[in-house]
From Swiss-Prot:
It comes from the Bacteria. Pathway: Cofactor biosynthesis; thiamine diphosphate biosynthesis. Its EC number is 2.8.1.4. This is Probable tRNA sulfurtransferase. GO terms for cellular component: cytosol. GO terms for biological process: thiamine biosynthetic process; thiamine diphosphate biosynthetic process; thiazole biosynthetic process; tRNA 4-thiouridine biosynthesis. One of its GO terms (molecular function) is CCA tRNA nucleotidyltransferase activity. The keyword Protein biosynthesis does not apply. SUPFAM superfamilies: Adenine nucleotide alpha hydrolases-like (SSF52402), THUMP domain-like (SSF143437). It comes from Staphylococcus saprophyticus subsp. saprophyticus (strain ATCC 15305 / DSM 20229 / NCIMB 8711 / NCTC 7292 / S-41).
Length: 407
């Protein structure tokens, strides 16, 4: 079937009132950004839905794959726009039906927003269903659980027909909910946390703490790849890579071994707090999950949070690990996250870390050394990369150039 439009149904933004236009306009911009590399389409949005007009030869499959990742979209359907006659509806319904397998069932589902159309909803359903049965001998009707649902939308300008509904990502358009800084470790949890806040319309920049030579270049490349996957949902993402070696080594010199994990995370939070203000963000996001590891007890979180007044969002706080893994697999980050490259959270891990840290004790250990210059040094040394869905590292680019020269 050759379609001429893609119908985009809005998600939660349909609940908005006077400010709905802001959300629709942002979603339209995000859709254009997602489709930008492709050709042969025009995006038209109104208050209730969006239509993408397709030129001949447009890559509908690739467009749908991109659109279903855009937050704010409830579902999409490739559709055909036809003239407002019963004959045209019958003809197209029969074309749909002839592609179905022997023994399949179908249903005709009509929505009629144009009340001046000469057939009411039920009369049109009966007429079109009868036309399909008359023209085929391999199908039967099932109005409760059909294999195929042929949908007919009678609107003021035309009739739109389709038989596919592709689930979207839901949520709100990214860019309507402020900006956050995502602490991206390289593990399973933090990319999922990033997706969850982006689903609520929040723009994300990411921060990663890199401690060479204790963490390898492979660990850095892993985080870049995770950011690249996330950017497939929202467009380019800034990744701030923090040189954390000196700060982490000093923590391990002056802080009691059982408290080094708590203190290390406090230093990360101090760096992140400065970056939040530099990029004009409004919160810090991490992938912490209550009780999952020693640093994720309530007392640990309290001790770590104590160094910042910036809100810290934890979208995964109460989820089971199995649910987080499932989400990671769905968004495509799981296989990257489990690559066995250590990050700065796993090096120098004490054998018996404190799980219920006393905030007065950790402050006592830290007060013996002025960490502020090292914190500022880490901020000043940040490397910022703009990661897109087709991002290639300098190493990858050089390798590709060499291959092109050789072959």
């Amino acid at each position: 079937m050759i379609y001429d439009h893609i119908l985009v149904r809005y998600g939660e933004l349909t609940l908005k009132g006077a400010n709905r236009k802001i959300f629709v306009n942002k979603l339209r911009s995000n859709v254009k950004l997602a489709l930008m590399p492709l050709q042969g389409y025009t995006v038209k949005a109104n208050r209730d839905r969006m239509y993408i007009e397709l030129d001949e030869g447009a890559d509908i499959e690739e467009m749908c794959n991109r659109l279903k990742k855009v937050f704010g979209i409830y579902s999409i359907s490739p559709v055909l726009k036809i003239e407002k006659t019963v004959e045209a509806v019958n003809e197209l319904a029969v074309r749909f039906a002839k592609e179905y397998a022997d023994g399949d069932t179908f249903k005709i589902d009509v929505k009629r927003s144009d009340k001046n159309f000469p057939y009411d909803t039920y009369a049109l359903q009966r007429t079109v269903g009868g036309a399909v049965l008359d023209a085929t001998n391999h199908l039967s009707v099932d109005v409760h659980n059909p294999d195929h649902n042929i949908k007919v939308e009678v609107r003021l300008d035309a009739i739109y027909m389709y038989d596919q509904v592709i689930e979207g990502s839901g949520g709100l358009p990214v860019g309507t909910g402020g900006k956050t800084l995502l602490m991206l470790s390289g593990g399973i949890d933090s990319p999922v946390a990033g997706i969850e806040v982006m689903r609520r319309g929040v723009t994300v920049e990411a921060i990663h703490f890199h401690s060479p030579p204790f963490t390898s270049e492979k660990a850095k490349e892993k985080v870049i790849e995770l950011t690249r996957i996330l950017s497939g949902h929202v467009g380019p993402i800034k990744l701030h890579i923090v040189p954390f070696t000196d700060l982490q080594k000093q923590v391990n010199k002056v802080v009691h071994e059982r408290y080094t994990m708590t203190s290390t995370r406090r230093m990360m939070m101090r760096v992140a707090d400065k970056v939040v203000h530099d990029i004009d963000a409004h919160a810090i996001v991490n992938g912490e999950n209550l009780g999952q590891v020693a640093s994720q007890t309530l007392k640990s979180m309290y001790a770590i949070n104590h160094v910042t007044s910036t809100p810290v969002l934890r979208p995964l706080l109460t989820l089971d690990k199995e649910d987080i893994v499932k989400k990671a697999k769905e968004i495509g980050t799981f296989d990257v996250s489990i690559q066995p490259y250590e990050d700065c959270c796993t090096i120098f891990t004490p054998k018996n870390p404190i799980t219920e840290p006393d905030i007065e004790k950790v402050e006592k250990y830290e007060i013996g050394y002025d960490f502020e210059p090292l914190v500022q040094q880490a901020v000043d040394g940040i490397e910022t990369l703009l990661i897109t869905s087709d991002y290639q590292s300098e190493k990858d680019t050089a390798t590709q150039a060499l291959a092109d020269d050789l072959f």
